[in-house]
Amino acid sequence: MKTTFDPAKRAWTLVHRGLDFAVDAAKVFSGDTVTMVDHRFDYGEVRQISAGFLEGRMVVIVWTQRGTSRHVISMRYCHGKEEKRWRKILR
């Protein structure tokens, strides 16, 4: 599936988090992931939160389906407690 993103958000995330939407999101989605719909707010679109692994570290990606593309909104490494919760679901 094609990945799209806002170039400015990609650049910010690359500088501040060392994660690249263009390359790293595809790596995460090529492995085992768990995905849940984000119901916290009305975003005007269905946003999904996926957790998976990038080079052995757990990553969370917020994204939405746009046509046939997966549009990445944010991406970051998980914190300790958060990773424990996601690992329970991934098992």
Regions found by a protein language model. Give the residues of each.
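Ribonuclease/tRNase effector modules and their secretory precursors
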Residues: 1-91
